A protein has these predicted regions:
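N-terminal active-site segment of His-dependent metallophosphoesterases
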Residues: 1-92
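Eukaryote-skewed repeat-based solenoidal scaffolds used as protein-protein interaction platforms
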Residues: 59, 91-108
Length: 108
C-alpha cells in the first residue's frame, strides 16, 4: 500500500498575506478598500489550500517545514499582521495543519 507524504511550509499565519482559516477572515463588507482586498485574498488563498489538500487526501504524513506563524512582525513594525497575539497565530496554524487530516504530523 502506498503512503502519501506531503510537505508544506511558509504558512505565515497571522500575516495579512499568510494562510488564514475562515474563523479569522476579515469582513468584506467594509468601506476600507485595503480590508476588502485582504478579505478577498484570504478567501482565495484558503480555497486554494483546501482544494490542494482535498486533492492530495488521504495523507499519511504531513511535514510542516517552518514559518507556520508570522511571529512579532518585527521587519514591518507589526503593521502587516492581522493577528499580533502569537497564541492566535498558533491556533490559526493548527487549524491549517489539522485540515490535512494526516495520520502523522511532523513540524520542523
Amino acid at each position: 500500500m502506498k503512503k502519501r507524504l506531503v510537505v508544506i511550509s511558509d504558512l505565515h499565519c497571522g500575516h495579512e498575506y499568510g494562510l488564514t482559516p475562515p474563523d479569522w477572515w476579515y469582513n468584506p463588507q467594509t468601506e476600507h478598500a485595503h480590508i476588502r482586498k485582504m478579505a478577498q485574498f484570504q478567501r482565495e488563498l484558503w480555497g486554494f489550500y483546501t482544494k490542494a489538500m482535498d486533492d492530495l487526501k488521504p495523507i499519511y504524513a504531513l511535514v510542516v517545514n517552518g514559518d507556520s506563524i508570522e511571529g512579532k512582525g518585527e521587519r514591518s513594525g507589526s503593521t502587516e499582521l492581522n493577528k499580533d497575539a502569537r497564541y492566535e497565530q498558533i491556533d490559526m496554524a493548527a487549524q491549517c495543519i489539522q485540515y490535512a487530516n494526516a495520520k502523522k504530523v511532523r513540524i520542523l
